Amino acid sequence: MKMFCYQCQEALKNTGCTTIGVCGKTADVANLQDLLIFTLKGISFLNLKAREVGVNKEKTDRFLIEGLFSTITNVNFDRNFFLRKIKEAVALRDEIKEDLRNKGVRVDEYKNIDAISWTYGTDADIEAISQEVGVLSTEDEDIRSLRELITYGVKGMAAYAYHAYQLGYKDDNIFKFMEKALAKVLDDSLTVDDYVALAMETGKYGVDTMALLDKANTSTYGHPEITKVNIGVRNNPGILVSGHDLKDLEQLLEQTAGTGVDVYTHGEMLPAHYYPAFKKYPHFVGNYGNAWWQQDKEFELFNGPILMTTNCLIPPKDSYKDRVYTTGVVGFEGVKYIPEGPDGKKDFSEIIEHAKRCKPPVEIERGEIIGGFAHNQVLQLADKIVEAVKTGAIKRFFVMAGCDGRMKSRTYYTEFAKALPKDTVILTAGCAKYRYNKLNLGDIDGIPRVLDAGQCNDSYSLAVIAMKLKEIFGLNDINELPISYNIAWYEQKAVIVLLALLYLGVKNIHLGPTLPAFLSPNVTKVLVEKFGIGGITNVEDDLKMFLGA
């Protein structure tokens, strides 16, 4: 069976995966994901019409964000999950049609739109249709490129909206925009210029969604504060929490209190330690390991069970597969799943009992790392930072936010961080930080040279900080600040962060280790001419370029 997927940075030969994903996704799963997205586009088209006549159901909003999130790289690999979701999507689509008919809307007028009208009899029908609706069904290379750019941005937006929703925060305008964007990528009358404008609008709603999630996280758990995080281990059994979901972590910490089981973060969960609300748990020990792609070795050594709350999951080895638990929209065939109850709560008793039977984690490193430099904390230090800039103690900031990945060429980011002059400061968020957050880069007048704002969505914090500095220095343009952008990307959440930065007017962003495979030459040319987007070359030449040497 054939597939075509080029949504992540590791797309084969920077062109696309055609038989199996570099991520481990099989062709049938890739195609089913395409069909789910296709059907969500149909649902979006219909739900916009339903909104016009006063019909909008909460379950449609939730289904949309969960469906989109499940197709992000390294979230869900389970064929049966996608078959089930597609059937649910068709049922929901038909329910919205019925609601429209009851309101007097002539739904038959839309029967020529395949995303709205396709049907199935058997699973084999679903499999067959799934092979016809993928990325390559758009023939024009530039239109295809822009449609995918927008779709991947909306996937990233959906992930952030999902996390906010889990904490009880929702903005109907964001859901409306996601539906609008997905409906418009079905519209063959739109031009390249139309889609460029829609991509910028996607960036605008990306900012709004990250702001909403920031509000959800900080209202629930307090503002991140400067925190030293232990990277060693204790002599108790433990549970390792990976992904991004703070609510799952909170529930697990509550349920493990007094059990003798320690809880550790992994990967993108590291920033949980920065929130005041999580500091009251004495059994919340520290962070274990590094970025997602090293999990095959680190999960093995951890000895205890692992809870995957979101991406990034890689296909687990048999040696530890029985210790992996998934929840939310994460899935992998043969791995245990912890569902959400009708009350929104999760019962973690099985994973806790499992942990009690396990040996303590193997120590892989010791010491501490520092983080918690989100916008509220950094703005408390604003006077000190401004003074350091004015005196020349800080000459330049480098935003090195984003994602980490497997490619050997990503050692560039470690070498780049090491080579930066001592009068520069790195601003980071996301798992890209693991390439340099354990280096001893020192400080400038007490300001650490690596300021970690948090998870990938906390790139929003970096934008807030930049806007505030622009205001303090009385500048007209954000690009007049002594800030350079050298961003590492991997999956679709990085796409919405990029579009958000472009919407905010940030120019001359450098993206690596490769430019996205889904950007056609012409679309790349537009981004270069309009926004100064660039790639990376080597540390020495790039430093000269950034520093104007």
Swiss-Prot record:
It comes from the Bacteria. CDD domains: HCP. One of its GO terms (biological process) is response to hydrogen peroxide. SUPFAM superfamilies: Prismane protein-like (SSF56821). Binds 1 [4Fe-4S] cluster. Binds 1 hybrid [4Fe-2O-2S] cluster. The lineage of its organism: Bacteria, Bacillati, Bacillota, Clostridia, Thermoanaerobacterales. The gene is hcp. Its cofactor is [4Fe-4S] cluster; hybrid [4Fe-2O-2S] cluster. It comes from Caldanaerobacter subterraneus subsp. tengcongensis (strain DSM 15242 / JCM 11007 / NBRC 100824 / MB4) (Thermoanaerobacter tengcongensis). It is found in: Cytoplasm. Hybrid [4Fe-2O-2S] cluster binds at H244, E268, C312, C403, C431, C456, E491, K493. Keywords: 4Fe-4S, Cytoplasm, Iron, Iron-sulfur, Metal-binding, Oxidoreductase. Pfam families: Prismane. Catalyzes the reduction of hydroxylamine to form NH(3) and H(2)O. This is Hydroxylamine reductase.
